[in-house]
């Protein structure tokens, strides 16, 4: 596998995406501002530039960062091992510093399985140019059939939590820069906009649905009015 390539097959993806845009009809219904998950992703605001993020990487002082609730044995193990470490910042409870500053100040951002695998952490870390480290066995990550996850993220088995620092330090500076550059290439696919933008998170989810259009089957009475 070519770890420099962020797509499994970019040409097929681009052609299929064009066909999806041409043939797939999408109707968007507005949500209320207080709906669950309405504000789960970080606001776009002014997006950090690629050059700025690479320069910040050269000054990132923390090896790795995690902050979150201790709601699973995996997170509990992470905190037990690394809570007081000087290079891996593993934190539970309220942060004393802004969350974005921690993402900007860390080389690797830990995505640790909680009561569910899927959170906004991967999108957050990519947004700020922090290489995601996924610590969760038997997981299904977003867009895995489109994106080459190994080109911009690291997978660590939960049993290897005590070896986390050793694993991360195996990556040379050049290898880390390759991972980070690839992370910046794919971050557009994980970003959410109030009005969808081509290839953003909304369109990528629609593309995933479009790919599975022939495998989704609904009962014949699904659209029959009860009256």
Q: What name fits each language-model region?
A:
Residues 124:
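Acidic donor-binding helix in nucleotide-sugar-dependent glycosyltransferases
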Residues 1-120, 128, 134-155, 162, ...:
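Nucleotide-sugar donor-binding catalytic core of glycosyltransferases
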């Amino acid at each position: 596998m070519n770890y420099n390539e962020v797509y499994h097959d970019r040409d097929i993806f681009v052609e299929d995406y064009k066909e999806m845009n041409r043939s797939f009809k999408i109707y968007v219904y507005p949500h209320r501002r207080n709906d669950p998950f309405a504000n789960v992703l970080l606001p776009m605001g002014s997006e950090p530039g690629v050059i700025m993020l690479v320069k910040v990487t050269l000054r990132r002082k923390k090896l790795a960062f995690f902050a979150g609730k201790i709601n699973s044995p995996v997170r509990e193990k992470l905190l037990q091992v690394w809570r007081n470490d000087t290079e891996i910042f593993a934190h539970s409870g309220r942060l004393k510093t802004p969350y974005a500053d921690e993402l900007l100040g860390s080389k690797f951002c830990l995505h640790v399985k909680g009561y569910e695998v899927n959170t906004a952490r991967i999108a957050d870390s990519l947004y700020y140019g922090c290489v995601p480290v996924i610590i969760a066995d038997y997981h299904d990550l977003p867009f895995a059939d489109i994106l080459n996850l190994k080109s911009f993220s690291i997978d660590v088995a939960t049993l290897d939590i005590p070896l986390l620092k050793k694993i991360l330090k195996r990556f040379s500076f050049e290898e880390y820069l390759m991972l980070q550059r690839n992370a910046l290439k794919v971050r557009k696919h994980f970003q959410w906009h109030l009005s969808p933008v081509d290839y953003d998170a909304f369109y990528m989810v629609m593309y995933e649905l479009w790919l599975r259009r022939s495998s989704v089957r609904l009962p014949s009475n699904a659209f029959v009015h009860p009256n």
